[in-house]
Every structure is written in C-alpha cells, then in structure tokens.
C-alpha cells in the first residue's frame, strides 16, 4: 500500500503523512532501532504543514526513544530526540493532554526532574480529559508512567484502568501487552496481588498467541 501511494503525485502534506505512516509501522513492528529517528524526521516534515500532528509525532518519537533505550539508532537517543522536540512550535490552540505531555517529557530529559515536575503534574491532571479513541493509545501509556513518577497514585490507578479498557474496546492486540503492564504496576503498588497475577497470566497468554 505504501508503494502504491508513492507511485502517484503527492502534495507536501500527503508526503509527510506517508512518512508518518511508514515511521509508525516501523515503530509498531520493531519497538526500537530506527523507529525514533523515523518518527523524528516525520515530525520535522510536518512542522510547516500541520503543527498539531507534528507535535503528536514528536511525542511518538520521544515515546519510541524511551522504549528503544540503548537499541535506538545513532542520533535518536532519548536526550537527542527530546532536545529536538523541545524546539517544536507551540500548539496552535489550547494545549491538549498530549501537548502537555510533550512539554513535560522534553523538560524532563533536557532540564531535569525539578524543572519538569510542574509540567508533568499538569500533564497528568489533564490526561483525565478524553481526546479521541484512535489518538489516546499513542500517549495514554506515557501518562500512566508519568503519574507514577510524580506520585499521583489516584490518577495512576484511573489512567491505567482507562488505558486497558480503551485497548480492549479497540481490539488493539498489539497494544494489549503494554496496557496490561501499565495496569499491573499500580495494582502491585496497591497490594492487589490477586488482580495483578490474573493480568500477568493474561499477558503470558497474549504473548504466546
């Protein structure tokens, strides 16, 4: 399908969206390696075309770099991706939860925890606001992680529950292991060992399928 799309004449927006699809495909199938760099390049292409989509893609790039860790390609470490993403244009309208997460995460990796803490708290609080079912899986797991980092146990519980419910509703099987992991952690922290064990068993079943 990508090859067919490339065969025809493409506008700048269509070309940028094609690169984004390619980058997200690599991210979904490899969870590391080239994904952060491809997403970063796609975000840069989108900057002059669609700022909201560019910022969402920068957030995807930061998330991919976090996930990839040492497996990220040269030039796409979490610090390097965050530094580029921090220079992204501001959102064109009122900042949405993914915008606030992007600002908080880039501050965390470029300026440190103390500078990022107010931004991360704001992002976690805003994450209670629903956006779109298609968009939320891209950032909701990060909101769960950040809720634990800022010691917001109530929202950690709420967001992890919403994340796994959303993934189940969408039938997004590729996202289910990550959603289960995000849900297991607050359950363990709260001492709900039986519920956590049940989800761990489900994780094994999904991964073996």
Model regions and ranges:
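Repeat-based scaffolding regions
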Residues: 1-28, 34-46, 57-60, 73-77, ...
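Extended non-membrane alpha-helical scaffolds
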Residues: 29-36, 51-209
